[in-house]
C-alpha cells in the first residue's frame, strides 16, 4: 500500500484538485492546491502529519483484514465483518425500516382519508384540500437539513423516539380536526417532525455501513415506504368496516397514530447513541467496530463540526446537480403517494375498492426495488438504475396520459410506480456514498432533500379536482420533470467521471515520479484514491 502525504503548492500547477496543507507560519490550515514541481532537481516539500497517521492505519488494516477490496479496506468477507454485519442487519435494519414505514404511513394517510370523506365532513371547498397536502411540505423542507445534524447532537435513541412520539400523537389528534384551519395546523406540525426522519435514517445507515454495502440495506428500509402505502390501503379498507360513532377517516387517523406511538419504546431503548455501544454487540465486536471506523472513507466518530465541511458541500456542483435531479424525481413520487387512491377512484372504482387497488401496486414496487438494490450493490453502480427507473416511470405516465380505457390506465399505474422509489432512493444513495466527511455529507444530503421535499409544494398543486378524471396537467408536468431528471443524471455521470479522470492523472503522475500519493483527511472524497461511483 502506498504512503500518503500532503504537499505544499509550488508555482507551477498541473492539477486543480483541492487539498489542505499547513501554512508556513504553522498557523491553522487552509485550502491549497495539490501540485507538482515541473522544474528538474526540485522536490516538493513533504508534510508528514497525514503520512504518520495513514501509516498507522495501513498497519491496522493489515491486521484486521484477511482480504481487501480495491480501496484497501477490509473486505465484507472478513469473518468479523460478517458477524458485525449480520447483527446490524438483524437488529438495526428492521428498526430503521419500521420507522420509515410509520413515517410514510402517517404522511400519506390524508389521501386515504380524502377518499373516505374527509373534505366533505370538515367542509373543504375548492383547492383547500390541495393546500392542506401542500403545507405539509413547507415545514418538511425546512426540517430536512436539521435532521442530519440533530442525529449527531442528540444521538439516535433520543432524536428518533422524540420524532416518532410527536408525529404519532399529531396523526392521532388529526382525527378530531373540525375545519380547514385546524387541518392546516396539524399538517404543518406533522411535516416538521416527519421531515427529520428520512435524512436521519440515511445518515445513520451511512455511518453503520460501507458504501458498497449500502444499497441493499437501504432497500429494506426504503421499501417500507412501498409497503406502508399498501398497508395504508388495507387499514383504510378495514376502517370502512367499523361500525361506530366516528367517521371512517377518523378511524384511519386513530389506528395509524396509535400504531406509531406503540413503537416508541423500541427506539428509546433499542438503540444506542454510538454504534459501538449497542447492546447486541459483545466486547470483541465493539472493539472491532471502533477500529472499523478508521478504515471507512465516509465516517470518523471523532469528527467535530467545522464550517469548512459545510462550505465544501455547498460549493460542490455535484451536490446541486443531484438536488435538482431529485426535485424532478420526487415531484412524481410525492404526487402519486398522496393522489393515487383518488386517481384510481376516477377510473370508475368505488371508494372502498380503490383503497384495495393500491395494495398490489405498491407490493410490486417493493419487489422491483429489492431486485434493483441487489444488483446496484453487486455491480457497484447507481446511475444505470436511476436512468432505468426514470425511463420506466416516464413510460407509465405516458400510458396513463394517452389512454381513456380504465384497464389500460390502471396497467400504466403499475409501470409508473415500479420506478418512483428506485430512482429517488438511488439518487440519495449515490450522493451519500460519494460524499466523505460526516458534516459535508450531512450538508449535501440536507440540500438534496431540501430540493426533493420542496417538490411536494408543487405536486400538491398540480393534481387538482377540476382535472378529474385524467389529471392531464399533473401527469404532464410529472412526465416533463422525469425527462429533466434523466438529463441531470447524465450530467452527474459526466461530473463524476471527470473527477475520477483527474484523480487517476494525479496517481499516474505520482507513480511516474516515484512519489507517494497525496492525502488529507479533511477532504476525504477529494483525495485521489477515493473513487466516485457512477
From Swiss-Prot:
GO biological process: carboxylic acid transport; quinolinic acid transmembrane transport
Region (Disordered): 21-56
Transmembrane segments: 131-151, 153-173, 188-208, 218-238, 251-271, 324-344, 356-376, 385-405, 411-431, 445-465, 475-495
Phosphoserine PTM sites in chain numbering: 27
SUPFAM superfamilies according to UniProt: MFS general substrate transporter (SSF103473)
GO molecular function: carboxylic acid transmembrane transporter activity; transmembrane transporter activity
Extracellular side: 1-130, 174-187, 239-250, 345-355, 406-410, 466-474
Domain of life where this protein originates: Eukaryota
Localisation: Membrane
GO cellular component: cell periphery; cortical endoplasmic reticulum; endoplasmic reticulum; fungal-type vacuole; membrane; mitochondrion; plasma membrane
Coiled coil: none
Residues annotated as signal peptide: none
The entry's keywords: Isopeptide bond, Membrane, Phosphoprotein, Transmembrane, Transmembrane helix, Transport, Ubl conjugation
Residue location of crosslink Glycyl lysine isopeptide (Lys-Gly) (interchain with G-Cter in ubiquitin): 283
Database matches in InterPro entries: MFS, MFS_trans_sf
Residues on Cytoplasmic side: 152, 209-217, 272-323, 377-384, 432-444, 496-534
Pfam families associated with the record: MFS_1 (PF07690)
Lipid bilayer topology: Multi-pass membrane protein
Entry-linked Gene3D superfamilies: MFS general substrate transporter like domains (1.20.1250.20)
Record-stated family: Belongs to the major facilitator superfamily. Allantoate permease family.
Function description: Involved in the uptake of nicotinic acid.
Protein name: High-affinity nicotinic acid transporter
Organism of origin: Saccharomyces cerevisiae (strain ATCC 204508 / S288c)
Top-level taxonomy: Eukaryota, Fungi, Dikarya, Ascomycota, Saccharomycotina
Gene: TNA1
